[in-house]
A protein has these predicted regions:
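Conserved N-terminal catalytic/coupling substructures associated with nucleotide/phosphate chemistry
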Residues: 1-292, 300-404, 417, 423-428, ...
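Conserved N-box helix within the HATPase_c
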Residues: 295
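Short alpha-helical "packing" element that flanks the helix-turn-helix/winged-helix DNA-binding module
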Residues: 408-412
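Extended alpha-helical interface modules used as scaffolds for assembling large macromolecular complexes
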Residues: 441, 450, 471-491
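Short, cationic-aromatic polyanion-contact patches
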Residues: 456-479
Length: 491
């Protein structure tokens, strides 16, 4: 009961947000709750509490109305979750938990917590549309928004689109090397690509897929009138300086060609740039780049292979004195997030491209879903910080830091993963340091863009969370308290 009380105290203090909503089980609750559940699944996940008044109408324990107000509505919602959502949200993915509590009138009662994960799919309600979550409330999505979300989640991929490109433009050295390695000898290029799924019929014509153009054309960007190359920027110092004289060490390098060559050439170019010996950092100290080469290769490979080719933008690699950044167009596919990337299973946005590149004589470093884990292990073995991922509006950036990792970081990282944020006082207790030392540590992590600070509650109450984090810190902490008590929807 003590743990329940702690959870309830947190719940009643929360206002509605992109990841949280509370509802009384009366009136039109079932329809609105179903919309919220679908909206959470289609956005970032979230928590819906039944039997609790809205924050704008009551405060504290006065919000605890209880589900006995309309218990039948809760049963109806359970049924509709299973039968009115398409495609269905797996029943085991939705966590339901009843909590006993003292209601606003002093009587004993129950509320229900429903935890909905971010889904790898895009869900709709039968005869009630497709919904997304806003900062407060839900909104029905337009057809264009649904299409964009399908591309973003990897439900559909631009690689499978048919393009009106002559097959002779794909009959390159890369194509011949690929065919020789696979033992594909019979038929012309059109027939061969059709047989292996890299071309399909449309109106009695056989056309190549975008994947075929990306994998074999000498200049995919030119042929597709798109931006499907890799660009490398090498900066002096630790940040981009905007001004009359940019702090680029040299002209940006554009690397184009078939994807297999983009990966190889970009990797070799970056390795050559960081292997030129010592560089003078802006601090005046000499620095040596210590990144494991396997990690750099994997970061580039992932950016090229798993990017969203629906977005017209190149992959950007930025080299600084203290880090390498690789920015890949498109968000994480499926339900992978910055919080789960280190241990999430593989989810390929572009299976045609992945399968194609595996069949080259010297395939890129595709480790059957283990590449990200390898990166974390290799950076740890080198004594460096683990890779950091940040989600931006329509891209994902991986940061490889050329910085020695202090032992306390593992505890700090785990604390933030469980609670969503950390404060100066909490770091003092974890690291057994004074306030000044904790402030210096936090300030450095912010400068390295590993953490970002929230001062909305004042400087003394500053909270730090991982940069580019996609989850609501409040929800993270609550979910960690519920995860050991998971119950099915059939309460």
């Amino acid at each position: 009961m003590g743990n329940n009380q702690s959870i309830i105290e947190r719940l009643v203090s929360w206002d509605e947000s992109i990841s949280f909503e509370a509802k009384r089980v009366s009136g039109k609750m079932v329809r609105k709750a179903l919309e919220t559940i679908v909206a959470f699944a289609n956005t970032k996940g979230g928590i819906l509490v039944l039997g609790m008044e809205d924050y704008s109408k009551a405060k504290g324990t006065d919000r605890l109305i209880g589900i006995q107000e309309n218990a039948e509505a809760v049963d109806e919602l359970q049924q509709k979750i299973q039968h009115k959502i398409i495609p269905p949200i797996p029943i085991d993915d939705v966590l339901w938990k009843k909590l006993n509590c003292i209601l606003h009138d002093g009587n004993s009662g129950e509320i229900v917590i429903i935890s909905v994960p971010m889904s790898p799919k895009v869900h709709s309600i039968v005869e009630d549309g497709t919904w997304k979550r806003l900062e407060k409330g839900n909104r029905e999505m337009t057809a264009a928004e649904i299409n964009e979300l399908c591309f973003s989640r990897g439900v559909i991929s631009a690689e499978s689109e048919l393009v009106d490109v002559p097959f002779e433009l794909l009959n390159t050295d890369s194509w011949r090397s690929y065919c020789e390695n696979r033992g594909i000898n019979s038929g012309d290029i059109k027939d061969r690509m059709f047989r292996i799924g890299l071309a399909r019929k449309k109106d009695n014509l056989i056309l190549p897929t975008k994947a075929a153009v990306l994998c074999f054309a000498e200049d995919p960007s030119g042929i597709l009138s798109s931006k499907d190359s890799v660009r490398v920027f090498h900066y002096a110092g630790t940040r981009i300086e905007h001004g009359a004289v940019p702090n680029l060490l040299k002209k940006p390098k554009t690397i184009s060609g078939p994807l297999i060559k983009q990966i190889t050439n970009a990797y070799e170019y970056v390795i050559n740039e960081i292997a030129k010996g010592l560089t003078i950092a802006t601090s005046g100290f000499e620095t040596v780049h210590r990144y494991p080469t396997r990690v750099i290769r994997e970061a580039i490979t992932n950016a090229v292979i798993h990017r969203d080719y629906h977005i017209t933008r190149d992959v950007h690699i930025r080299i600084f004195d203290n880090r390498i950044e690789v920015e890949s167009p498109g968000l994480f596919p499926g339900n992978i997030t910055t919080e789960t990337i280190a241990y999430a299973g593989s989810f390929s946005r572009n299976p045609l491209i992945v399968n194609c590149l595996r069949e080259f004589p010297e395939p890129p470093n595709i480790d059957a879903g283990e590449g990200v884990r390898m990166m974390f292990a290799a950076m740890q073995a080198q004594g460096l910080y683990p890779p950091f991922y940040s989600s931006r509006r329509d891209s994902v950036v991986i940061f490889l830091l050329n910085e020695e990792r202090p032992p306390v970081w593992e505890q700090v990282s785990e604390w933030i993963n469980r609670n969503g944020f950390i404060t100066n006082g909490q770091l003092c207790r974890i690291a057994t340091v004074d306030t000044l030392k904790a402030s210096k540590m936090l300030r450095k992590w912010v400068e390295l863009e590993m953490l970002e600070v929230d001062m909305s509650k004042g400087k003394k109450n500053a909270r730090y969370r991982k940069a580019g984090s996609e989850a609501d810190g409040n929800v993270i902490g609550l979910l960690s308290g519920l995860s050991d008590n998971k119950k099915s929807p059939l309460l």
